[in-house]
């Protein structure tokens, strides 16, 4: 599973720990019974501003180490944003703070779950 914008890290104990942080945020949505999503961790090849990427409706997400290092709240916003792309195929929406193209608003856990749930209900 590759992308041209993020270079995958090879799996190791350290990478597994990073990946676990991403998966823990996915588990915060387990009440919605989401499909299995493949998760890769890596580093941006070109733009340091890139925090994550998803294959639209293909249930694959890439999260950068930089996003993980920005803390739990930022990481949750990035993970939920990429999940909307990966699961539902929905593109950016500047009117929704979760789905803006740039991470301008950092949402609380409750607000992230609330916005994600709206997409889940819309597409299920």
Where are these predicted regions, by residue range?
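Short alpha-helix carrying the canonical HExxH Zn2+-binding catalytic motif
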Residues: 71-87
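Metalloprotease/metallohydrolase-associated module, dominated by Zn2+-dependent proteases
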Residues: 4-73, 90-124
């Amino acid at each position: 599973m590759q992308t041209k914008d993020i270079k995958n890290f090879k799996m190791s104990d350290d990478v597994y720990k990073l990946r676990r942080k991403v998966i823990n945020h996915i588990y915060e949505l387990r009440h919605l019974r989401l499909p299995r999503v493949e998760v890769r961790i890596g580093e941006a090849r070109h733009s340091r501003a890139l925090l994550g990427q998803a294959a639209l409706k293909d249930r694959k997400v890439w999260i950068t180490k930089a996003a993980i290092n920005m803390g739990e709240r930022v990481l949750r916003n990035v993970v939920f944003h990429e999940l909307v792309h990966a699961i539902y195929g929905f593109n950016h929406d500047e009117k929704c703070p979760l789905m803006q193209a740039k991470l301008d608003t950092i949402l609380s856990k409750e607000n992230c779950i609330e916005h994600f749930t709206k997409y889940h209900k819309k597409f299920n």
